[in-house]
């Protein structure tokens, strides 16, 4: 969170030192588009100019970013700063932070909105970090409804149900 909360700590000297340790990848934690300021843009630019690929790992937080329009603005804003939205984590049930927790359904709704209304580059993966060390599990909207011999039935991001060819090459469709 340092480039977000204390961006002036990102200096030329720091970037020169980090350059010596390639490959180096840095994931940041922006949670709301209001955190994208002139100072954080400058810090991200300095890190990216040093050849460091930047990603972002947001935490889905009630009242902070649990709105599809807020999350879209955040992810599009990050791309403009050369930061690739990487993960949105569902908040864990940690004592003292439970009031920030949302339902998983809200996260899936946000992901469906992002899928339909922004660039694929601005779509992170929604993740539940499973309890007891069971690992990161992606939470994906269900788009495949059924599999047939020659077609699959799918739901588009708009909710339209269509049949799609499920054959080898040389199949045309409208």
Q: What positions do the PLM features span?
A:
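Short, well-ordered coil/turn segments that N-cap beta-strands
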Residues: 22-24, 50-53, 82-84, 122
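Catalytic cores of alpha/beta
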Residues: 65-78
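Short, solvent-exposed loop/turn segments at secondary-structure boundaries
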Residues: 9, 66-68, 98-101
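Auxiliary Fe-S-binding modules of radical SAM enzymes
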Residues: 79-174
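Aromatic/hydrophobic pocket-lining residues that form the small-molecule binding cavity
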Residues: 11, 40, 71, 107
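Mobile, glycine- and charge-enriched loop segments
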Residues: 40-67, 157-174
């Amino acid at each position: 969170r340092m480039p977000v909360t204390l961006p002036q700590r990102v200096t030329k000297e720091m970037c020169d030192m980090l350059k010596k340790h390639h490959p180096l990848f840095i994931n940041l934690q922006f949670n709301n588009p209001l955190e994208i300021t002139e100072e954080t843009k400058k810090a991200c630019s300095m890190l990216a100019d040093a050849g460091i690929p930047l990603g972002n790992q947001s935490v889905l937080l009630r009242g902070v970013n649990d709105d599809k329009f807020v999350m879209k603005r955040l992810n599009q804003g990050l791309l403009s700063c050369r930061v690739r939205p990487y993960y949105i984590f569902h908040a864990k049930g940690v004592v003292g932070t439970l009031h920030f927790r949302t339902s998983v359904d809200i996260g899936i709704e946000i992901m469906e909105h992002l899928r339909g209304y922004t660039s694929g580059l601005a779509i992170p993966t929604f993740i539940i970090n499973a309890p007891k060390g069971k690992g990161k599990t992606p939470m994906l909207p269900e788009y495949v409804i059924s599999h047939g011999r020659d077609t699959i039935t799918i739901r588009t991001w708009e909710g339209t149900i269509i049949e799609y060819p499920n054959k080898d090459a040389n199949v045309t469709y409208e």
